[in-house]
């Protein structure tokens, strides 16, 4: 064997594997020292304290329940001239009841009461594709569980038409038992009161924030954080104006600089051509008259126009003003003189009219709140329908047809004067 190949095939023994040493990190020693010092400092209850350090903290979260839903039979609606007050729905409900043939004709629907308002969708599966109806909460002026027809729940809604026109309509639904109608009325009243209080609170907070921004600076006071808006959600009591159908559509305004320049030049030329003390100008000034009288005439015309638009809302005001004056005022008509409403100052008349219109936003309740809250049969139905509770809706049921014949005949006489629009 050659000398340089002598150790070529020597085999070396494999070294034994090293045992993994226990980690002696800083964190382990720190935890051990902290636990030992805690146990020495607090010998009583040390184990429970140590366990609470490593125990996960449990949090209780309130999950919002679904909005209460009821199965109803929608009977229809009828126009009314009273937005609130005891008995304001008697005539309209009588018309609806006679039109629906004592509750035998109607549309079966699912009615949901929420912070947005009253939502109704068709209950039949074949009619699910048909659009539902949403009655916004801030436009509902009155609700009641009718005492003459115990199974009928009615509400007055302020419909907004084109050109800011307003129409009051009474809607009525038939339910399976009187307690359900009372529960629906109580639930709508409570929901409206809570939503209105929340709307006022948010409005006051926004107003205070805007005032601080005006005083201190816009960049100093931040707006409401996005997380709070996502957590609580916007207030549904009164939606923004852009969602209203009567709101005007705003578009872009294009400026015509050339046209403005030409108009300004023509105006300057006319001023230069017409000298001071021109007799034509004096005649125009004499024809213009006193500006104070013009302003008074404009205010009278404005109040008369508002009176024609909101005539049904001003009946009580006119009657009270007529009694105070001894019945000396004339009737309001095309050829008549100014109404009794115009005898006061323009500011007082505007204030009274605005107060009447602003009061429409608050829901008026036609039943006794304390009596309904104390009735357990009513309060247990506030969460919605129970199983089999809609079994006797169709056909009116025995309680629904037990209305007095005198009321039905009396209301049927007035039904021909004003035909209701069924929904």
From Swiss-Prot:
InterPro entries: Adapter_Engulfment-Domain, FAM43A/B_PTB, PH-like_dom_sf, PTB/PI_dom. It comes from Homo sapiens (Human). Residues 263-298, 321-344, 382-423 are annotated as: Disordered. Residues 263-283 have a biased composition (Acidic residues). Residues 401-411 have a biased composition (Polar residues). Residues 323-335 have a biased composition (Gly residues). Residues 383-393 have a biased composition (Low complexity). It comes from the Eukaryota. Belongs to the FAM43 family. This is Protein FAM43A.
């Amino acid at each position: 064997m050659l000398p340089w190949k002598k150790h070529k095939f020597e085999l070396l023994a494999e070294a034994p594997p090293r045992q993994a040493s226990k980690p002696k990190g800083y964190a382990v020693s720190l935890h051990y020292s902290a636990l030992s010092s805690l146990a020495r400092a607090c010998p009583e209850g040390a184990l429970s304290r140590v366990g609470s350090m490593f125990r996960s903290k449990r949090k209780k979260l309130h999950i919002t329940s679904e909005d209460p839903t009821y199965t109803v039979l929608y009977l229809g609606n009828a126009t009314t001239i009273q937005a609130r007050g005891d008995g304001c729905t008697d005539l309209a409900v009588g018309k609806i009841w006679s039109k629906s043939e004592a509750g035998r004709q109607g549309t079966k629907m699912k009615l949901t009461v929420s912070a947005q308002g009253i939502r109704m969708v068709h209950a039949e599966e074949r009619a699910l594709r048909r659009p539902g109806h949403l009655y916004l909460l801030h436009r509902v002026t009155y609700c009641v569980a009718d005492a003459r027809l115990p199974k009928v729940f009615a509400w007055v809604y302020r419909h907004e038409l084109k050109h800011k026109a307003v129409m009051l309509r009474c809607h009525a639904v038939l339910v399976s038992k009187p307690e359900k109608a009372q529960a629906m009325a109580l639930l709508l009243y409570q929901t409206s009161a809570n939503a209105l209080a929340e709307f006022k609170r948010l409005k006051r907070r926004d107003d205070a924030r805007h005032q601080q921004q005006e005083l201190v600076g816009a960049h100093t006071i931040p707006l409401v954080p996005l997380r709070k808006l996502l957590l609580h959600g916007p207030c549904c009591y009164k939606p923004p104006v852009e969602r209203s159908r009567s709101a005007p559509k705003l578009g872009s305004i294009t400026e015509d600089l050339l046209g403005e320049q030409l108009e300004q030049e023509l105006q300057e030329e006319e001023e230069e051509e017409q000298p001071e003390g021109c007799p034509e100008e004096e005649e125009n000034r004499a024809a213009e008259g006193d500006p104070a009288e013009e302003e008074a005439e404009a205010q009278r015309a404005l109040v008369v126009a508002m009176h024609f638009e909101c005539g049904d809302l001003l009946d009580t005001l006119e009657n009270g003003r007529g009694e105070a004056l001894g019945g000396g005022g004339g009737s309001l008509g095309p050829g008549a003189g100014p109404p009794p409403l115009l005898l006061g100052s323009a500011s007082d008349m505007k204030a009274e009219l605005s107060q009447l219109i602003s009061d429409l936003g608050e829901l008026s309740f036609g039943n006794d709140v304390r009596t309904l809250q104390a009735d357990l049969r009513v309060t247990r139905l506030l969460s919605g329908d129970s199983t089999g509770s809609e079994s006797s809706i169709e056909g009116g049921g025995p309680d629904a047809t037990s209305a007095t014949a005198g009321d039905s005949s009396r209301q049927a006489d007035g039904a021909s004067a004003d035909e209701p629009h069924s929904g």
